[in-house]
C-alpha cells in the first residue's frame, strides 16, 4: 500500500529497516521487497548494519539517516521507515541537515512510516503512515476466541491473518 504510493508520487522508496525486536521487523522488510519486485523496481534497504536489539527506534532512524545525509545520500529520495518511531528519528536527521521532507514539494525528500503512532499527526511535518485496522484486528481476535470456546478440541496452531492497513497521507510524503 505505502510502497506503491511512494513509488507513484516520489520515486522508488528506500526502506529504512528497524531493530529486530519483534516479529514484524523482518516481515515488513520482506513485504517491501515483494512489492518492489512486483512493481519492477530494485529494492534498496538501509540501516541493517546498525540494527540492535535495544528497541531505540528513534535513535536508530536518526543515526542511520544522519550518516547518509552527511554524505549527500538519499536527500532527494522517498524513504519508507519500518515504523513511525524510526520515521521520527528520520525526520530529526532531515532537520539536522536542513532538509524539509514534504508531499507538497515536487521531487525532494519524502519520509513515511507504519503504525500511525499517536504522535505522527503532531510531528512537523505531519507523518505519512499506514494505520493498522484496529477494528478488524479486534473482530478477528474475538472470532478466534469464540471459535476456541465453541470447539471442544480446538487446535491451538499459530495462525497469521493479514489485515489491510489504511494509508494516512500527511505532509511528510
Walk through the language-model features, giving the residues of each.
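Bacterial carbohydrate/catabolite-sensing allosteric modules
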Residues: 1-173
Amino acid at each position: 500500500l505505502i510502497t506503491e504510493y511512494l513509488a507513484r508520487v516520489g520515486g522508488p522508496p528506500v526502506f529504512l529497516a528497524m531493530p529486530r525486536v519483534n516479529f514484524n521487523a523482518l516481515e515488513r522488510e520482506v513485504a517491501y521487497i515483494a512489492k518492489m519486485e512486483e512493481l519492477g523496481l530494485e529494492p534498496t534497504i538501509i540501516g541493517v548494519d546498525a540494527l540492535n536489539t535495544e528497541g531505540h527506534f528513534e535513535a536508530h532512524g536518526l543515526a542511520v539517516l544522519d550518516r547518509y545525509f552527511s554524505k549527500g545520500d538519499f536527500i532527494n529520495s522517498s524513504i519508507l521507515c519500518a515504523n513511525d518511531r524510526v520515521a521520527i528519528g528520520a525526520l530529526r536527521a532531515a532537520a539536522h541537515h536542513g532538509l524539509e521532507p514534504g508531499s507538497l514539494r515536487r521531487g525532494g525528500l519524502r519520509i513515511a512510516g507504519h503504525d500511525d503512532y499517536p504522535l505522527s499527526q503532531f510531528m512537523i511535518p505531519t507523518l505519512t503512515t499506514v494505520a493498522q485496522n484496529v477494528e478488524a484486528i479486534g473482530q478477528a481476535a474475538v472470532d478466534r476466541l469464540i471459535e476456541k470456546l465453541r470447539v471442544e478440541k480446538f487446535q491451538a496452531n499459530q495462525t497469521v491473518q493479514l489485515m489491510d492497513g489504511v494509508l494516512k497521507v500527511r505532509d511528510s510524503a
